[in-house]
């Protein structure tokens, strides 16, 4: 048995006039979903606990962009479309037997692609939404593992055995420059093109989501967030706040938002935290965190391996 304890919140921050972020909590077996619905002046932490079964539990963060109400519409379209598509008839029968263990990431991938098409079409045909888009970073939990999908620069972190790992890579121009060794990570923090991302839902008709799988350990804490959090709270402080509140992660959500606002709060702030427990999970260890990169074009083939680094 595997259980997942979930806490999520979204906050307008201190500067923005509206909240263009959104989050998703989805229990597929129960056909129940939760998204950010609080008013701009409210602060609410949504908390749920589920047993993870073969149908899976999905979490996501989406950061909208586009001005006026366009960003808010884009992120809501993203989480709503993904939720609706995942609750439709199961396409598992179309997969090969070897691929059946990947049924949730296949569904999540297809739902993300469909969300992109809908956001892109809305922006193309409706002048008030022209140019709108949204990031989308999601996680799917099944007994086979934790599946991760990413479009844009909303991040996923893992806190394991008191250490923190960034398990996604920003799909951004400055990250590309870092990879090419043209700038340092420190220089990226103040780079004039810091906010330029390489892909987003709605920006183009075609997207290429990055997909991966993590083998979870007992007491792993997974964290999804928009850049309103990751730009304002260092990895070390993320780790400290999560570890200090490991027995009350709803408080960790509140403390993370408070920290981001204390450091300026110029952007909307969204965070989803999930803690895994259960007899079927490996005990936490200090080994390297291995990510299995999944080729969605040939899903049953042996996937590449990547390693997450301690931050």
Stretch-by-stretch model annotation:
Residues 1-311:
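PP2C/PPM-type serine/threonine phosphatase catalytic domain
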